[in-house]
Amino acid sequence: MSLSRRRFIQASGLALCAGGLPLQARASGAQAVLPVPPLLESRRGQPLFLSLERTHWAFMGGRKVGTWGVNGVYLGPTVRVHSGDDVKLIYSNRLSESVAMEVAGLLVPGPLAGGPARQMSPGVDWSPVLPIRQAAATLWYHADTPRHMAPQVYSGLAGLWLVEDQYSKNAPLPNHYGVDDFPLILQDKRLDNFGVPEYDPPSSGGFLGDTLLVNGVQDPYVEVSRGWVRLRLLNASNARRYLLQLSDGRPFFVIASDQGLLPAPLQADTLPLAPGERREVLIDMSKGEEISITAGEAAGIMDRLRGLFEPSSMLVSTRVLTLRPTGLLPLMTDTLPARLAADPLPEGDVVNNRSIMLGSASSPGINGALWDPGRIDVQARQGTWERWTVRADTPQSFYIQGAQFLVKSVNNAPPLVEDRGWKDSVWVDGEVSLLVYFPQPSSEHFPFLFYSGTLELADRGSVGQMVVQPAQ
């Protein structure tokens, strides 16, 4: 059959375009090994140092490019602290612009919570002493600089922060960091042909990249022992929500959410992960079969070709991580504990009901008002409970600093099973009802913040301020 001139040109053009695809869109070579961030553990009497600085990192192809990071690496070390300790933390800003930092999910008084009120100019340090008085949980630290949070987090100012307590130390769960207990920080970026991250914030809504990174690399693998493997998942993307699943269809065993362990392990076939959310899961590798975690549907060839001429929001590859079991099955394999949390989830009497309306992609703000550092939007009382009804026409994540909450309903239906524990971040697509508890006080000079987890919307004003009066 003859080939017409037009069809020949079309076919030739597709072949040429495919040959000129960005490196991340072509078939890759050997998979990268999962980088495990170094562990920075608190020791009594010794401060923790977090230096915010320029560094270099190879996002693809082994070629290092300039970026930001903490303590010399893209993203930062995993900090591990222990409940009951008082931890001296020293942030050092070695960058050329001002930065504010926050440990999202850390329950400390307002003056110690970081954020805009603790902004550091270039060359300046901030040294809070943090009383760690909460249950074991996977938290994260990140830039929280007014109107610059999105580009600074995107550039690499983020990392995991683990709280351990006596119960978590003794629980029959994998806890050997980097061996059977792995941090996974998910981000989406746009990389040019040389592997340099590009950031061009959209005029409305949040930034969506086309390249999925895990701990700073694409499509990594990790070798694990045959047995239970624990994954601590963090969505550190600016706006993208992920829907995770396992390649062979088996369920995740979910053991923890933002603010700590669930009452008992739960099974979930798919696992949503909104910006700022953390979840901990267990995967049974005892059968000795390789398995992958995926995050939705990847872009097809035509979508990749369009990406040559215009920014794409579809991920080139959606494979998060491949787990490769090695060695023999241990002589003894632990079964899942029937109970996880040391204490049942309490509930108290609601003293106030609030309605929170999050701004849209084109019209940011909260309850119709843009962030004003001189205005207090919410007055609450330490040790009390409130019901917050949060609404959004534009789907987005929502975070409350200095508080913890239980999700009571989502669009008038029961919440997902994996959302039954203590949380500080939640996906809002319509309406969610939250039972909010305030364990720590704040003040007008050092208020807590609540804001959109779509970081570009937060930078444009989708932020509110809250004073929690000390308990009487």
From Swiss-Prot:
Compartment(s) where it occurs, according to its Swiss-Prot or TrEMBL record: Periplasm
Gene3D superfamilies listed in its UniProt record: Cupredoxins - blue copper proteins
Record GO cellular component, one term: cell division site
Superkingdom of origin: Bacteria
InterPro entries: Cu-oxidase-like_N (IPR011707), Cu-oxidase_C (IPR011706), Cu-oxidase_fam (IPR045087), Cupredoxin (IPR008972), FtsP (IPR026589), TAT_signal (IPR006311)
Post-translational note: Predicted to be exported by the Tat system. The position of the signal peptide cleavage has not been experimentally proven.
Record-level GO BP terms: FtsZ-dependent cytokinesis
GO MF annotations in UniProt: copper ion binding; oxidoreductase activity
Record key words, sorted: Cell cycle, Cell division, Periplasm, Signal
Record carries keyword Cytoplasm: no
Signal peptide feature range: 1-32
Function, as annotated: Cell division protein that is required for growth during stress conditions. May be involved in protecting or stabilizing the divisomal assembly under conditions of stress.
Family as reported in the entry's similarity comment: Belongs to the FtsP family.
Identification of the protein by name: Cell division protein FtsP
Organism whose genome encodes this protein: Edwardsiella tarda (strain FL6-60)
High-level lineage: Bacteria, Pseudomonadati, Pseudomonadota, Gammaproteobacteria, Enterobacterales
Gene: ftsP
